[in-house]
Structure formats: structure tokens, C-alpha cells
């Protein structure tokens, strides 16, 4: 998912924590 991709994790802190 998104949180396994560093850039997506950075751009989605409300999803990934």
C-alpha cells in the first residue's frame, strides 16, 4: 500500500502515521 512507499508515506502522514 501507500505506506510502503517512502514518498507516499511522507506525503500522507495522516494515513501512515
Curated annotation (Swiss-Prot):
GO terms for molecular function: acetylcholine receptor inhibitor activity; ion channel regulator activity; toxin activity. PROSITE patterns: ALPHA_CONOTOXIN (PS60014). It comes from the Eukaryota. Disulfide bonds join 2-8, 3-16. Changing residue 10 to K: Very important decrease in ability to inhibit alpha-7 nAChRs, and moderate decrease in ability to inhibit alpha-3-beta-4 nAChRs. Keywords: Acetylcholine receptor inhibiting toxin, Amidation, Disulfide bond, Ion channel impairing toxin, Neurotoxin, Postsynaptic neurotoxin, Secreted, Toxin. The keyword Disulfide bond applies. GO terms for cellular component: extracellular region; host cell postsynaptic membrane. Changing residue 10 to Q: Moderate decrease in ability to inhibit alpha-7 nAChRs. Belongs to the conotoxin A superfamily. The cysteine framework is I (CC-C-C). Alpha4/7 pattern. This is Alpha-conotoxin OmIA.
Amino acid at each position: 500500500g501507500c505506506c510502503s512507499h517512502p514518498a507516499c508515506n511522507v506525503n500522507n502522514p495522516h494515513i501512515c502515521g
